[in-house]
Amino acid sequence: MKFQPLGERVLVERLEEENKTSSGIIIPDNAKEKPLMGVVKAVSHKISEGCKCVKEGDVIAFGKYKGAEIVLDGTEYMVLELEDILGIVGSGSCCHTGNHDHKHAKEHEACCHDHKKH
């Protein structure tokens, strides 16, 4: 099933958490905390055509009590507001890698900082 987030939102599939501790104790599913990281599966048109700070395939970190959970085709996802994303894990867009090679400083400001005005 296709899902297109609206506004400044992204669709995220949580990353699986480890099933056992470092000492080998198996953690039952009902005792595990849900991971606070996931893979972006879809971005809204407002983000893909505007900010472009987050794109499909990025691994992101987000706040513990943020977003809305939905189930699509038996898979659990989160719908998150752009402002609820804490950061991109690993390499991301120019604004999250420190590579600010925009030809114009205004382009960088528009790309990465407009969503922080809220």
From Swiss-Prot:
Source organism superkingdom: Bacteria
SUPFAM superfamilies: GroES-like
Biological process terms in GO annotation: chaperone cofactor-dependent protein refolding
Predominant cellular place of this UniProt entry's protein: cytoplasm
A GO-annotated cellular component: cytoplasm
Gene Ontology terms, MF aspect: ATP binding; identical protein binding; metal ion binding; protein folding chaperone; protein-folding chaperone binding; unfolded protein binding
PANTHER family to which the protein is assigned, alphabetical: 10 KDA HEAT SHOCK PROTEIN, CO-CHAPERONIN GROES
Protein task: Together with the chaperonin GroEL, plays an essential role in assisting protein folding. The GroEL-GroES system forms a nano-cage that allows encapsulation of the non-native substrate proteins and provides a physical environment optimized to promote and accelerate protein folding. GroES binds to the apical surface of the GroEL ring, thereby capping the opening of the GroEL channel.
Name recorded for this polypeptide: Co-chaperonin GroES
Organism: Helicobacter pylori (strain ATCC 700392 / 26695) (Campylobacter pylori)
